Amino acid sequence: MKKTVQYLIVAALLLLVGGFITYRAMLTVPSAELAPEARVLAILEEGGCISCHSANPKVPFYAHIPVAGDMVMKDIEDGYRAYDIEPAMAKLKEGAMLNPVDVAKIEKVAQDKRMPMAKYYLVHWGSQMTDAKAAVIAAWARDYRMAYYHDGLSGERAGEPVRPIIANPDVDQRKVALGYSLYHDTRLSVDNTVSCASCHGLNTGGVDNLKYSKGVAGNMGGVNAPTTYNAVYNFVQFWDGRAKTLAEQAAGPPLNPVEMASTSFDEIIAKLAGDKHYVAEFSALYADGITEANITNAIEEFERTLVTPNSKFDQWLLGNNEALSADEVLGYELFKANNCATCHVGANLGGESYELMGLRQHYFEARGTELTEEDNGRYKQTQVERDRHRFKVPGLRNIELTWPYYHDGTRATMEEAVRDMALYQCDVVLTDAEVASIVAFLRTLTGEYQGQKLTSDNKQ
């Protein structure tokens, strides 16, 4: 009997040691002989990311067990709601370039080792994120950004998820001048009272600083006006992404019944055709003269020049360590630590993806007001339920000038906006000191337009 017990103890120890050795072996990183994207893909596949973050999740066998199954299905629901990784993994397989938001999210989750969750990797051996795996992903993310952006970042800042604005737009200056005139021309509206600049003033941060903009006859819109500065960096235009280009965006407000309320572009063209200056300029620049396409093309060409480089933060990114104070640098580190830089990425610190408003806390329930059509966000265009309350992420350049904040204009100050973003998106309660540091960083994002620091005629 005693020998039997001893044998059992030895066998158990051997199983434990063997299991530990097997477990450690399964945690090794993919071979360095593989291409970087193939190594990252292997880590993501081993981590079981597709099990939750997909419209077509790979449901594990224990999902059909009572109680455990409910937990699994809730994790899948939450995972897909937060992030769909399937398109990114498909691009990794193809060796194609990813959206920079995908890169930032994958890198940050690996860095924090937040995924996969312990309850997953304790069942699925080898899936756990390790320092070695995170290092592979970090190196890939850095190399990706150096290839994706051509902005001169090098050294310790080459891998930053936020990038400097390098202003060198390749534009036709005559079209720019024409677009400037059209941008400020009230004849695009039905009663000749509203222009693009009425809601997007160049002297007011590219916005009007109103909760909702005022259109013809005093009509009020239903969504906060985004800035036109740096809009060229957005992957789509409008909060709901209904315009793919600046030209498409420019075609919207003139025919919007609340904003400019013209009945057609034929009506607008008839007005402009009575202006000898416009007739001459359009004839010189476009073979077919004044048309809807040419009007919006000229406005687009002008808006491509509305970039604001050389902010204090840009100077710091490009190597001037004296450009930011210690508190401003701390604010940037807090910005990254609290996952802000997984959505607010790139040169515009945003405008690269659609994200859910109220990811971790119920924003609209807490707001306590009736839902509007504009609150539906991307859903307005797609009618896909997952897109409800998803919005194009706003850029943060010149944010100190573009109050009020959010799509509904409900936050009057940067302090309010920062504090509530952390709560509703990340379930984080920031201290007053942390909020102050992040706001100090955000103020460093105000850049220059035509060689002068951007300012606003409006005072908050």
List PLM regions with ranges.
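Post-cleavage N-terminal segment of exported redox proteins
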Residues: 1-35, 113-178, 261-329, 333, ...
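N-terminal secretory signal peptides
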Residues: 48-54
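Short glycine/threonine-rich turn/loop motifs
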Residues: 42, 58-87, 156-252, 315-412, ...
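Short extracytoplasmic/periplasmic juxtamembrane "stem" segments immediately C-terminal to an N-terminal membrane anchor
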Residues: 33-48
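Axial heme c-ligation environment in periplasmic c-type cytochrome domains
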Residues: 59-62, 82-103, 108-133, 228, ...
